[in-house]
């Protein structure tokens, strides 16, 4: 570890790195400069997931530099408005160790907290404002210059093709027992092309998207409760704004566990949908085209279906991607997503009216 730390020009000795945070993808540590008491985050990039660390860090540096300039222009604190990458002595955004491990350092954003679950509707609203502001501030960033850090990440037609292959191969002999779920996915095949076709036709613009818009990817100000800074930028890529909106809705607009086995407890919350829509569009609305706003419900439905079919495909393939604690966990996860989708379909007109209300 000392050889790794020596790649940065610290202001004197630093403390021993201590494991920090609850992330599952990258190893993360906190450390402190002893002379200044300034804290930093040291992360090892998971190059199994992110195979192009150069492209990954080029994305992150480009976007965070841009966000800092925007913060200065509006009179906000640029060091709290976004992450700040500490460059190595060689002027690089990460260090490649002798064993091939790739490490990076961020300034620690003080007086902030990361929430793992929605504790109040205000938390969900503040997360919407934070992600909406992320879209607003990056509206004029050239999205086509970003690297695709995980190819086809939110390519729903490709996810469906992968699902179909998992069903056909049926490696674990489980398909016969989940025909109802398989047919639920197949019955919505036409839906999976809606957003991609609009993008291909030039009717929807390519945006800078976060692609993992969960509550725990925001730093909240401990004093004010404000959603301050969007973090975990590894999946920042070109994409559709509706997908970022939709992933938040999928994750947050319900009160159930992700693997709830009692589907009577799984309900899509229109109240939380409206709270999030209000915050998201208040922060980002003027940056979006009318059609982008109209298609936000499609983002919610497609991100939920995409996640559900990925859970079901993993169940059919032997649970090799998503970690499980019991045999049917991925199946329960899939059923939960499908129940949320069915609820959205029943409330489609109401969802559209809520979008119109805040346009």
Please state what every model-predicted region is.
Residues 17-20, 24-162, 239-241, 252, ...:
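Conserved ATP-binding subdomain of kinase catalytic cores across diverse folds
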Residues 288-300:
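All-alpha amphipathic helical-bundle segments outside canonical DNA-binding/catalytic cores
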Residues 344-347:
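Long, compositionally biased intrinsically disordered regions
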């Amino acid at each position: 570890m000392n050889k790794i730390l020596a790649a940065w020009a610290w202001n004197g000795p630093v403390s021993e790195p201590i494991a920090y945070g609850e992330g599952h993808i990258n190893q993360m540590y906190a450390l402190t400069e002893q002379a200044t008491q300034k804290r930093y985050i040291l992360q090892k990039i998971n190059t199994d997931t992110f195979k192009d660390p150069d492209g990954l860090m080029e994305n992150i540096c480009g976007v965070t530099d841009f966000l800092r300039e925007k913060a200065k222009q509006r009179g906000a604190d640029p060091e709290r408005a976004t992450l700040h990458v500490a460059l190595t002595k060689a002027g690089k955004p990460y260090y490649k160790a002798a064993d091939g491990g790739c490490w990076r350092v961020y300034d620690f954003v003080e007086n902030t907290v990361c929430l793992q679950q929605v504790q109040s509707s205000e938390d969900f609203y503040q997360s919407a404002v934070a992600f909406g502001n992320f879209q607003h501030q990056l509206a004029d960033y050239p999205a086509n210059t970003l690297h695709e850090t995980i190819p086809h990440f939110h390519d729903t037609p490709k996810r469906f093709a992968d699902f179909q292959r998992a069903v056909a191969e049926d490696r674990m002999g489980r398909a016969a027992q989940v025909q109802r779920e398989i047919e639920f996915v197949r019955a919505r095949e036409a839906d999976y092309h809606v957003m991609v076709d609009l993008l291909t036709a030039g009717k929807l613009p390519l945006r800078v998207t976060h692609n993992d818009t969960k509550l725990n990817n925001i730093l909240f100000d401990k004093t004010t409760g404000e959603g301050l800074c969007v973090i975990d930028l590894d999946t920042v890529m070109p994409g559709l704004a509706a997908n970022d909106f939709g992933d938040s809705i999928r994750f947050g607009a319900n009160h159930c566990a992700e693997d709830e086995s009692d589907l009577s407890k799984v309900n899509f919350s229109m109240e939380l949908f409206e709270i999030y829509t209000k915050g998201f569009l208040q922060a980002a609305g003027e940056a979006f085209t009318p059609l982008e706003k109209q298609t936000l419900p499609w983002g919610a439905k497609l991100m939920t279906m995409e996640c559900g079919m990925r859970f079901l495909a993993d169940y059919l393939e032997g649970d090799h991607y998503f970690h499980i604690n019991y045999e049917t966990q991925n199946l329960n996860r899939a059923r939960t997503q499908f129940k949320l989708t069915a609820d959205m379909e029943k409330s489609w007109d109401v969802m559209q009216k809520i979008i119109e209300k805040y346009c």
